[in-house]
Amino acid sequence: MDANSINSFFLIGALLTAVSVLLSPMSSRLGIPILLIFLAVGILAGEDGPGGILFDDYSTAYLVSNLALAIILLDGGMRTRVASFRVALWPALSLATFGVAITTSITGMMAAWLFDLHWLQGLLVGAIVGSTDAAAVFSLLKGRSLNERVGATLEIESGSNDPMAVFLTVTLIAILANVDTEMSFSFMFISFIKQFGLGICLGLGGGWMLWKLVNLSKLADGLYSILVLSGGLIIYAASNKLGGSGILSIYLVGLFLGNKPTRGRHAILNVLDGMTWVSQIGMFLVLGLLLTPSDLVDILIPGFALAFGMILFARPVAVWISLLPFKSFSSRDRWFISWVGLRGAVPIILAVFPMMAGLPGAQLYFNLAFFVVLVSLLVQGASLTTAARLAKVELPPKPLPVSRSGVEIYPSSEWEVFVYRLSESKWCIGEPLKRLAMPDGTRIAAVFRNDTLLHPSGSTRLEAGDILCVLGQEKSLEALSNLFSQAPENKEVQRFFGDFFIETDVKLADLAPIYGLSLDNLADDMTVADLVVSQLGANPVLGDQFQWQSLHWVVAGLYEGKVTNVGIRLPTEHAL
């Protein structure tokens, strides 16, 4: 490659990236996933689009996509709270294993019938599109206030289901490439255990070593993020090299670092946020360039049948069977999880495997995977907000600070500065600071008014437009945000958690005469907390609801996994 070609490469790459960034606001206006914008830019720049760029280097696409996916999973792991595993780990693992296998089987049979393929070839198509995509799920769920059980299950599933899909894809390619070779069940079982076992061990072990290394190192501030990124990629590559799941390993590395006091954690997350955006743009641009839309014309009708068959039948069946042991999931939860089986980059990456192996029909597999991804992003991704509202798994948006930044006083400091801007409808307007019930361990460090820094005292009264800088820790974030939150304008949001609240240590016997509750066959000392556990199980989450006798009960407050208060909606009001 000469200097002119290199400059042309830089020019085209930078131009496509800039166009993708500038077009990204269209995502919210059109109600479509932002990843689809990046993919569309790549397709338009490609062979059949106005750009006319001929790109058919599957090896380069595979390299770029795997690197990008590793970075996205590292960032996603660092932002996942281990506390969510309390309610979502086992359901997510069931979906990541049994769910993928069931989806693969049903989708594979449909593909074999629709495209007149051998049943093994059909299963290969099913395996390629069988897993949900972490990049798509993390991107579309980011910033959404979903029921914790549902949101965490979807995120953990997307971060851990790729090993199963990779295992099935690689195994089926090996069988199809050597049809005369018999592969024993024990061999396949050992391969499966190796993928998951090595992936988990190297992810957690490598995460611990990297965490120790980061905290013991004394580096320039900007180098910690590079150390984490390079360390994560080392573990990712080592896991793949040894036969484990690099995807699972790097997700667990991020999970370990994100849930431990890590030196420079906030700076690392800021850098990873930018790297994740670059990775998403680069990955979907390259995959878009790889597609020749005219090749999809011949598979249009059966392709739609396959995509909608997977969305409307295979995925729901897999979800309902996989979640059978978990009674805490309501029917609405299950339907929403079924609908958010988003496909993205991973199926396209897996579709490159047969191309690189030189399998007959590999181009068909690739085109089918791409078509399914396009339909999934357009149909499921674009309707995510509507689906969440219909399934009633979306909680009222949590009040959050305008910005937050770390205060790196100590190597593993967890102190942060939260910035709040007070509008006229904030609850605390007009109140002196001394009357604010500030959470323990927090302090208002500064108040800005009309671009002027005030020296706050107990008598300082807050005004609309004030900007507050509050020093505290993440554990106090919810209490602070509620204190400085805006009064909800939407009446439905106001009523989501009920007409009034009661604490869970209240005895039902005390409520019975007020609300006409019948307590036959119930213990005299039964509390509201006991009722919640009997109705929702041991691990309820914020927003969980149930109807009991004439009242509608909603979990309205949690502390360290325990329900602290419950909202009650009166029977005279219409129930959700």
Swiss-Prot record:
Main localization category: membrane
Entry's transmembrane regions: 6-26, 34-54, 58-78, 87-107, 109-129, 163-183, 185-205, 219-239, 242-262, 271-291, 299-319, 335-355, 359-379
Reactions listed under catalytic activity: K(+)(in) + H(+)(out) = K(+)(out) + H(+)(in)
Keyword Cell membrane: yes
InterPro entries per the UniProt record, alphabetical: Cation/H_exchanger_TM, FAD-bd_PCMH-like_sf, Na+/solute_symporter_sf, NhaP2, RCK_C, RCK_C_sf, Transptr-assoc_dom
Similarity annotation: Belongs to the monovalent cation:proton antiporter 1 (CPA1) transporter (TC 2.A.36) family. NhaP2 subfamily.
Name listed for the protein in its UniProt record: K(+)/H(+) antiporter NhaP2
Organism encoding this protein: Shewanella baltica (strain OS155 / ATCC BAA-1091)
